Curated annotation (Swiss-Prot):
Keywords: Cytoplasm. HAMAP family: FdeH (MF_00611). The gene is fdhE. This is Protein FdhE homolog. GO terms for molecular function: ferric iron binding. One of its GO terms (biological process) is protein maturation. Necessary for formate dehydrogenase activity. Belongs to the FdhE family. InterPro entries: FdhE-like_sf, FdhE_C, FdhE_central, Formate_DH_accessory. It comes from Aquifex aeolicus (strain VF5).
Length: 283
């Protein structure tokens, strides 16, 4: 099975993502403010995906196959020139300034004052080394996600050869996982990239952070009110990740469910666990 075959599912998922927001607001009333803000970001993402999907994006398939064969992510994004896509950064700033928090608005004003080469440098640095500034991380991933989503659409990989805990496309960590039935697998577990939203196959009973497979140190918690969301914790490395069961709720959108269920993150963190990777909203 090639990675590209999942994109029909993902494209439909992106189309229905906005329609999922009202449902999530009912399920998670405590997250309404977050979800209202998220709806504006999703509208921005969908418009960018729609526009960029019409462009001719060429990738070096030979280099991609070589990198994947060596266990490296298909794309070394820090080497890519994002200047042609920089025009999409400024609409994001306008959206955040209009709908974001006072702290976000202050950061928008700072980012608007930077020269283009400074913004490109921030993007390159983030893709090469990551970033510790939570607010800046939000802006950069919010901007990059729809662009890299279209890049990932061009990358093919064999799921059976990539049971790793980092993205086969961009190398980022997953922020959420989910279970679904496919033509090839029943009850298969997938990880979803925190940056480019690529999905890839992973062992169901294995810690995503450290690779632990010992049953006595892996626990699973399910809320009686949210039985389609499970939290997998690992006592060896004190990490956790959510598992969204699409067999119980076929309309669930894993990355959105993860953001909306921030109350579950707070519970897991109170128990002393650290998330494998935060979503782009920082939760």
């Amino acid at each position: 099975m090639w990675g590209g075959e999942m994109n029909i599912f993902k494209q439909k998922e992106r189309e229905f993502a906005l329609n999922r927001i009202p449902v999530l607001k009912e399920k998670f009333p405590e997250s309404n403010q977050i979800l209202n803000f998220l709806s504006h970001i999703l509208e921005y993402h969908n418009s960018i995906i729609s526009e960029i999907s019409d462009l001719s994006i060429s990738l070096d398939n030979q280099n991609i196959e070589s990198r994947l064969g060596k266990g490296k992510p298909a794309l070394k994004l820090s080497e890519y020139d994002f200047e042609p896509f920089l025009k999409y950064f400024y609409p994001l700033l306008n959206i955040v300034y209009e709908h974001g928090t006072p702290q976000m608005k202050e950061r928008v004003e700072h980012l608007q004052s930077l020269e283009k080469k400074e913004i490109l440098s921030l993007i390159s640095s983030f893709l090469e080394n990551g970033i510790s500034d939570d607010m800046l991380r939000f802006f950069l991933i919010s901007y990059l996600q729809p662009i890299l989503y279209t890049f990932a659409d061009k990358v093919k990989f064999e799921h059976e050869r990539w049971f790793k805990n980092y993205c086969p496309v961009c190398g980022s960590k997953p922020s959420v996982s989910f279970i679904m039935d496919t033509e090839d697998w029943e009850g298969a577990r997938f990880l979803r990239c925190s940056v480019c939203l690529t999905d890839w196959l992973y062992v169901r009973t294995k810690c995503v952070n450290c690779g632990n497979v010992e049953d006595d140190s892996l626990d699973y918690f399910i809320s009686s009110e949210l039985d389609y969301i499970e939290i997998q914790t690992c006592k060896k490395c004190n990490s956790y990740i959510k598992i969204i069961d699409l067999r119980k709720d076929g309309l669930a959108v894993p990355d959105l469910e993860d953001i909306a269920s921030v109350s579950l993150d707070l519970w897991a963190q109170e128990q002393g666990f650290i998330k494998v990777e935060r979503n782009f909203m920082g939760y």
